[in-house]
């Protein structure tokens, strides 16, 4: 049985994204702003942390008055303190997308996860830097919609059984934000 007519006529609108023209006009003015935040004082006890970068206070404060914000660069630094030589501390770090089910206990089972011994007689006392592979996750931390795959940092700390009274290392997150499209808000208060 053949059907000679179209039962439900279809609109012939072109909807392929590469064919649609871009909105005319200049690119938005972009502001680049560095940030750094202390996220953990470690070494006095065992600890685990899972930090979504968009939720870090310094990042959310900087992006408050902008509609769009992306990470240009991002890294974690482990800074040994004067307690480190006498009280070595094991620090594990791993960058994953925020929606990843990976937990801090799975750092060595995850691509890019690293474990460091901070302090001790023969270990490094220099700061250690681990860069976030932004090309492997979404660098957008603020937009008109919420993304679930922006960077998240997993941290695992194993302290000495006889831990010191003060931290053996300080962990900071640093980077550069690119922000544009200021929000129209009342700034008179």
UniProtKB/Swiss-Prot annotation:
<dbReference type="GO" id="GO:0005198">
    <property type="term" value="F:structural molecule activity"/>
</dbReference>
<keyword id="KW-1142">T=3 icosahedral capsid protein</keyword>
<comment type="function">
    <text>Self-assembles to form a T=3 icosahedral capsid composed of 180 copies of the capsid protein. The capsid encapsulates the single-stranded RNA genome. A pentameric unit may be lost during decapsidation.</text>
</comment>
<dbReference type="InterPro" id="IPR000574">
    <property type="entry name" value="Tymo_coat"/>
</dbReference>
<dbReference type="GO" id="GO:0039617">
    <property type="term" value="C:T=3 icosahedral viral capsid"/>
</dbReference>
<dbReference type="InterPro" id="IPR029053">
    <property type="entry name" value="Viral_coat"/>
</dbReference>
<comment type="similarity">
    <text>Belongs to the tymoviruses capsid protein family.</text>
</comment>
<protein>
    <recommendedName>
        <fullName>Capsid protein</fullName>
    </recommendedName>
</protein>
<dbReference type="Pfam" id="PF00983">
    <property type="entry name" value="Tymo_coat"/>
</dbReference>
<keyword id="KW-0167">Capsid protein</keyword>
<keyword id="KW-0946">Virion</keyword>
């Amino acid at each position: 049985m053949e059907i000679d007519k179209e039962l439900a006529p279809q609109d012939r609108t072109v909807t392929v994204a590469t064919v649609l023209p871009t909105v005319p006009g200049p690119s938005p003015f972009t502001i680049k702003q560095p940030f750094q935040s202390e996220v953990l004082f470690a070494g006095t006890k065992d600890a685990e942390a899972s930090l979504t970068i968009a939720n870090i206070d310094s990042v959310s404060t900087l992006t408050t008055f902008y509609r769009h914000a992306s990470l240009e660069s991002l890294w974690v630094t482990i800074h040994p303190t004067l307690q480190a030589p006498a009280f070595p501390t094991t620090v594990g770090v791993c960058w994953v997308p925020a929606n990843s089910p990976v937990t801090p206990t799975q750092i060595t089972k995850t691509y890019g996860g690293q474990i460091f011994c901070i302090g001790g007689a023969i270990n490094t006392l220099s700061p250690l830097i681990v860069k976030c592979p932004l090309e492997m996750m979404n660098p957008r931390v603020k937009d008109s919609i919420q993304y679930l795959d922006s960077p998240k940092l997993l941290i695992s700390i194993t302290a000495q059984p006889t831990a010191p009274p003060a931290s053996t290392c300080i962990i900071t997150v640093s980077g550069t934000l690119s922000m544009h499209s200021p929000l129209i808000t009342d700034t008179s208060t």
